[in-house]
UniProtKB/Swiss-Prot annotation:
Pfam family, one: Aconitase
Protein name in the entry: 3-isopropylmalate dehydratase large subunit
Lineage per the UniProt record: Bacteria, Bacillati, Actinomycetota, Actinomycetes, Streptosporangiales
Key words, A-Z: 4Fe-4S, Amino-acid biosynthesis, Branched-chain amino acid biosynthesis, Iron, Iron-sulfur, Leucine biosynthesis, Lyase, Metal-binding
First-tier enzyme category under EC: lyase
Swiss-Prot/TrEMBL cofactor(s): [4Fe-4S] cluster
Pathways per UniProt: Amino-acid biosynthesis; L-leucine biosynthesis; L-leucine from 3-methyl-2-oxobutanoate: step 2/4
HAMAP family per record: LeuC_type1
Record keyword Transmembrane helix present: no
Subunit field text: Heterodimer of LeuC and LeuD.
Family per record: Belongs to the aconitase/IPM isomerase family. LeuC type 1 subfamily.
Signal peptide: none
CDD domains: IPMI
Organism: Thermobifida fusca (strain YX)
Chain positions recorded as [4Fe-4S] cluster binding sites: C347, C407, C410
Name of the gene: leuC
């Protein structure tokens, strides 16, 4: 029987199946950070249990960490306690930890692929929504809650009910200036933030196959914003070339065996998806959000929509509420919206290719007066690589702030936040009310749009410069 890639990976990991019960899945890699792990470790301690597979568990500090003055004590007491608790727990339970200042520290969904820990055909979990990022390698990767984190720590398994499958087919070729971020924002605008609910989305088609691994990670990262549990892209030569030689990738004969297995993972000819969606890459242009959820997006050359244009009363009410919060009027040209802060970073767009793309736009230019730009590498390795290429000097010469690795302004859990009423163009993944700080207003954009916006001071693309 023809199977989808998600079905193949799922079946390979079922260790127990009983009628009327969820499947019990084996977990190949467990990623942890300081925010969702403390209660899980405490649960192990109270039950007098050991961590079952420390060798399949890796921890980093990312959500709460400051991105400057990283060797000073963390000012916020809650953040400081969470980081200190992770260090204590990692030492007690034998977990490999990459703390602030470590060369391999960074956002958990950046360092996993970077180290070669993320591989095709794996099951990967983390107490974090954007674990779907790792699906770019053909892994089944999804976020879990704190009680599930403890279950994986104790047993290296997880009881799960099989997901439905959805294919998002993106054919054609992207025009210059249009990126993976624009694809995924267009997908979410088309199917809505609940369109993928209960599904694993497999991204397919010519436009997807032509993307780099880092671009594929951007797309899979935001599957959650489409309501899906996970996102996947079939492994191919691009995947193998990215992984080969990385610290945890198989070596020698084991590499050859791994590649042979990975080649069996793509969806079989004739396999049936529960749902299919189609987009034409030729027709896509830079995309930006105007509202307070990632599905409220339009092409940059469009205008803020009128709530009355929505036939669904729920969507109409959501649009009215969003425009009130964002302080926008229907019919306003997106390019006329002034921006106070530009954030380049996050597990969506904080990798070396993202920094290169933005630096190319900023080279020889200046950040506009009155605009603050934060450039936050997704990991210390990314920061090191950017410095080796001179990208840091380009950012600093343009007037941007060059920071240490971390989640930063993606979420208001660290010192990098918006003030009430401030408006940002952000390469992150969520634009909810208060996401980047209480009263902050967020427009989701690609790195290219972020850089051009920093120069012009209004939402812009490089074509506007």
């Amino acid at each position: 029987m023809a199977r989808t890639m998600a079905e193949k990976v799922w079946e390979e990991h079922v260790v127990r199946r009983a009628e009327g019960e969820p499947d019990l899945l084996y977990i190949d890699l467990h990623l942890i950070h300081e925010v969702t792990s403390p209660q899980a470790f405490e649960g192990l301690r109270l039950a007098n249990r050991k961590l079952r597979r420390p060798d399949l568990t890796i921890a980093t500090e990312d959500h709460n960490v400051p991105t400057e003055n990283i060797f000073l004590p963390i000012a916020d007491p809650v953040s400081r306690t969470q980081v200190e608790t992770l260090r204590k727990n990692a030492a007690e339970f034998g977990v490999r930890l990459h703390p602030m200042g470590d060369i391999d520290q960074g956002i958990v969904h950046v360092i996993g692929p970077q180290l070669g820990l993320t591989q095709p055909g794996m099951t990967i979990v983390c107490g974090d929504s954007h674990t779907s990022t790792h699906g770019a390698f053909g892994a089944l990767a999804f976020g879990i809650g704190t009680s599930q984190v403890e279950h994986v720590m104790a047993t290296q398994t997880l009881p799960m009910t099989p997901f439905k499958t959805m294919a998002v087919n993106v054919e054609g070729k992207l025009k210059p200036g249009v990126t993976a971020k624009d694809i995924i924002l267009a997908v979410i605008a088309q199917i809505g933030t609940g369109g993928g609910q209960g599904h694993v989305i497999e991204y397919r088609g010519e436009a997807i196959r032509s993307l780099s691994m880092e671009a594929r990670m951007t797309i899979c990262n935001m599957s959650i914003e489409a309501g899906a549990r996970a996102g996947m892209i079939a492994p191919d030569q691009t995947t193998f070339d990215y992984l080969k030689g990385r610290p945890h990738a198989p070596k020698g004969e084991l590499w050859d065996q791994a590649v042979e297995y990975w080649k069996t993972l793509p969806t079989d000819e004739g396999a049936v998806f529960d749902k299919e969606v189609f987009l034409n890459a030729d027709e896509l242009s830079p995309f930006v959000t105007w509202g307070t959820n990632p599905g409220q997006g339009v092409p940059l050359d469009s205008v803020v929509p009128d709530p009355e244009s929505f036939t669904d009363p729920v969507e109409r009410a959501a649009a009215e509420k969003a425009l009130a919060y964002m302080d926008l009027k229907p019919g306003t040209r997106m390019r006329d919206i002034k921006i106070d802060t530009v954030f380049l970073g996050s597990c969506t767009n904080g990798r070396i290719e993202d920094l290169r793309a933005a630096a190319e736009v900023l080279k020889g230019r200046k950040v506009a007066d009155g605009v603050r730009m934060l450039v936050v590498p997704g990991s210390q390795r990314v920061k090191q690589q950017a410095a080796a290429e001179g990208l840091d000097e380009i950012f600093k010469a343009a007037g941007a702030e060059w920071r240490e690795a971390g989640c930063s302004m993606c979420l208001g859990m660290n010192p990098d936040t918006l003030k009430p009423g401030e408006r940002s163009a952000s390469t992150s993944n969520r634009n909810f009310e208060g996401r980047q700080g209480k009263g902050g207003r967020t427009h989701l954009v690609s790195p290219l749009v972020a850089a051009a916006t920093a120069v012009r001071g209004t939402l812009s693309s490089p074509a506007d410069l």
